[in-house]
C-alpha cells in the first residue's frame, strides 16, 4: 500500500507499507516439513528417469514374494523430499551431501511426512553451510521410514514461509 502525505510547505512524502511479515532467519533447531502421498504415476515417472524397473515397484506378486505387503515406492524417490523441502524454503540452495538409512518400506498411497531440522550452521564467504537432520515418517508420523543427514549451501538464512507450490 502506498500512502501520500503532504506537509504544509507542499512537500510530498511517499510512504510504502507492506503487509508481508518480517523475515524469519534459519537457526539451529528449526524444523521444516512437507507431506506427500506417492502414486503409481510417481513410481512410473521416477523409473523412466532413473531406469530402475525393479519388479518390486511394479508387480504386487514380486513384492509379496520378497516379503512386502505390496508394491514399493522407490526409496530414493521418497528421499527426494529432503532437497525439495530445503530448496522450497531457500531458493538457490545447493544440496551437497546426503546420508540415508532406509528403515521401513513405503507403499503407494502411504502419507509420508518429511522433516528437515537444522542441526549446525556456519557462515563462509557470504554463504551458509547448513547441516540438517533428515527424516521421513508414515503411519500418522509414528514410524520412521528414512533417516539421515544432509548438507546444503544456502545463499542466505532468510526462510520462505511457504513452498512455491502452495
From Swiss-Prot:
GO terms for biological process: fatty acid biosynthetic process; photorespiration; thylakoid membrane organization. InterPro entries: HotDog_dom_sf, MaoC-like_dom, UPF0336/Enoyl-CoA_hydratase. Its EC number is 4.2.1.59. It is found in: Mitochondrion. This is 3-hydroxyacyl-[acyl-carrier-protein] dehydratase, mitochondrial. GO terms for cellular component: mitochondrion. Residues 1-17 form a transit peptide. It comes from Arabidopsis thaliana (Mouse-ear cress). Pfam families: MaoC_dehydratas. GO terms for molecular function: (3R)-hydroxyacyl-[acyl-carrier-protein] dehydratase activity. The keyword ATP-binding does not apply. Keywords: Fatty acid metabolism, Lipid metabolism, Lyase, Mitochondrion, Transit peptide. The lineage of its organism: Eukaryota, Viridiplantae, Streptophyta, Embryophyta, Tracheophyta. The keyword Cytoplasm does not apply. CDD domains: R_hydratase (cd03449). Expressed in leaves, roots, siliques and flowers. It is an enzyme of class 4 (lyase). The gene is MTHD. 3-hydroxyl-[acyl-carrier-protein] (3-hydroxyl-ACP) dehydratase required for mitochondrial fatty acid synthesis (mtFAS). MtFAS are essential for photorespiration and plant development, probably by influencing mitochondrial membrane lipid composition and other lipid metabolic pathways. Residues 34-125 form the MaoC-like domain. It catalyses: a (3R)-hydroxyacyl-[ACP] = a (2E)-enoyl-[ACP] + H2O; (3R)-hydroxyhexadecanoyl-[ACP] = (2E)-hexadecenoyl-[ACP] + H2O; (3R)-hydroxydecanoyl-[ACP] = (2E)-decenoyl-[ACP] + H2O. Pathway: Lipid metabolism; fatty acid biosynthesis. Homodimer.
